[in-house]
Regions:
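Short low-complexity, flexible loop/linker segments enriched in glycine and/or proline
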Residues: 33-34, 58-59, 82-87
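Flexible, charged surface loops at secondary-structure boundaries
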Residues: 35-36, 150
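Well-ordered, non-membrane alpha-helical segments in soluble/globular domains
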Residues: 3, 52-57, 90-92, 139
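Distinct, well-ordered alpha-helical segments
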Residues: 1-6, 27-34
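Core AdoMet radical
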Residues: 12-26, 39-74
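Conserved strand-turn element in the central/C-terminal portion of the radical SAM core barrel
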Residues: 42-49, 66-102
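Accessory C-terminal segments flanking Radical SAM cores
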Residues: 82-183
Length: 183
């Protein structure tokens, strides 16, 4: 992730790079100077008893002098269901344009995604990781096109939408049974 952060900081059009985290994975001390970049801000969601390492992570940010905001879960919408929406391209473009998650870059063990929904849907088998919704980290040419030129993702047609104006739901409720995908 540190190489990706370094790469994204090189883009002049990005004035801030917000790193959203639950603080479960501690930061590597070797990258302290990188993380002190004036463009970087951490947004740490504290899930209370569901995430035991958050307070230690926040202390690490404080000790290092990183800019951060720690907060409980907020602004959750009903956007976690994976179901084929059968939209036209222009409708998916509109959904993407209004989406609050289209720039929530998400790194996984299999690729890099524009939004956590796309990465999670790919992990659950809704589409292949070779799809346009997630790219391999090592493919610099495709990564640049993905970051700069993407109009919408294939994953958009599986998403209910995450507009800033969407109704909010109670956050962090864990399901007792797996949800089904309607593909």
């Amino acid at each position: 992730i540190y190489q990706i952060i370094e790469h994204l900081l090189a883009f002049e059009k990005y004035k801030k790079l917000v790193i959203y985290t639950n603080g479960m994975i501690p930061l590597k001390a070797d990258y302290r100077d990188l993380l002190l970049n004036e463009k970087i801000v951490f947004s740490v969601t504290d899930y209370g008893d569901l995430a035991r390492n958050t307070s230690g992570f926040v202390k690490q940010l404080e000790d290092w002098g990183c800019v951060y905001r720690a907060h409980p879960p907020e602004h959750w919408t009903d956007s976690g269901r994976i179901a084929k929406q059968h939209r036209r391209d222009d409708q998916n473009q509109k959904l993407f344009d209004e989406c609050c998650g289209k720039n929530l870059w998400t790194l996984s063990d299999k690729g890099f995604g524009r939004c956590p929904f796309a990465v999670n849907a790919a992990h659950l088998g809704a589409f292949d990781f070779a799809d346009d919704s997630v790219v391999a980290v090592g493919d610099a040419e495709k990564l640049k096109k993905y970051v700069v030129d993407q109009n919408f993702l294939t994953a958009c047609d599986l998403c209910n939408g995450r507009a800033f104006s969407a109704d909010e739901i109670t956050p962090a409720i864990q399901t007792r049974t797996p949800l089904t995908m309607e593909l």
